[in-house]
């Protein structure tokens, strides 16, 4: 058996989850709305390659997510998920998409109206972990000043920002069609 390439030696980054949780909980509903995926690190669970558009609807307790875009095979794809407070009381969110498993998610930094920097990590036995990072934008493009804010947030927890790959967005994307999926 071979260890998947996204499972690497080391531990998850040290994040002050309690501080972030306390700051973000009162503003959680502000996270609702449309977010475009601007960039991400290698993630075998992200089945949508291009034009990634996420709609977050808040019901007072959790977000229902509709993610759409173009899959690796070139076809439109819709995935349904949920984002909710960790059910065991830990100070982070859990993200759970259909045909996957729930994973911890921390919003490292956001202003709720332009950008969000997201980090997910799971520690395994024997000193291994998997971490996945995302940069989201409220529009198909993201101003450099906000990209720099996310880069600084990730560097602050020692995530190598050269791991990020920009997501194709823009005029070649069928956003109007995606909205109807």
From Swiss-Prot:
Subcellular location, record wording: Secreted, Extracellular space
GO term, biological process aspect, one: response to reactive oxygen species
Broad class of the protein's primary localization: secreted
Tissue specificity comment: Found in the carapace.
Keywords: Disulfide bond, Pigment, Secreted, Transport
Record has Transport as a keyword: yes
Protein name (record): Crustacyanin-C1 subunit
Organism: Homarus gammarus (European lobster)
